[in-house]
Amino acid sequence: MISLLRARLRQGRQTLDFPAGPVPLPERFRGRPVLDGSKCQEGCRACVAVCPTEAIRTDPLAIDLGACLFCAACQEACLTGAVSYTPDYRLATRVREDLVVSGAEAKLATALDDAMRSLLGRSLKLRQVSAGGCSGCEAELAALGNVVFDLGRFGIQFVASPRHADGIVITGPVTGHMELALRETYQAIPAPKIVIAVGACAISGGPFAGAASSGDGVPADIPVDLYVPGCPPHPLTLLDGLLRLTGRIRAGTR
């Protein structure tokens, strides 16, 4: 016991002061891309050619973050600097179309309506379903529970039973073998409920889009309340999206 107490005193406080404090990110972190179509050379489609998920289009230049793997192959292929990645981790949106980036403007997630926020704003229980994922997004979601991010201090927890949940977090491209399980889990969650799509696979199918054994993300008849792009998204991207959805981070404050 004494050794544990000494270690605790030596290590100090490890939990990030988020969202109020500074946000430490790795030097190589790739966040929101910034595009400048005026730098594009006429007829050049180098970035389009190297994108593994066809997330980029030209005329006008735009990137679909819902399909983007953040591999930065487009940035390396662009000789004029029209595409660059910033350390901005704020990527989550409420609307699928807002994930299409065509400049430097960021369209961030907004809060739930007053009625839903009064129910879920301070206590949100989520059931996670890995619908054919590679465990990348699942690992980042699990990291939210460690001492650094401490998701529980915001009243947000993952639960084992959909009957105890207020919403569902979906990862993976939704393979044929997982679609029924996903639908049954969604149906088992009491209304009103929310749906959160995490990662490129859940949003668009990611690199598996169009594959015979997988879908193109969350089925169209399941309404999504929050999209969190990335491959996988950083825990801070996930936390930022959840706090914006529940009204803990208000629009224009950060």
Residue ranges and their predicted role:
Residues 1-50, 54-59, 76, 81, ...:
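Non-ligating segments of multi-cofactor redox enzymes
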Residues 238-246:
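Short amphipathic C-terminal alpha-helix that caps PH/PH-like domains
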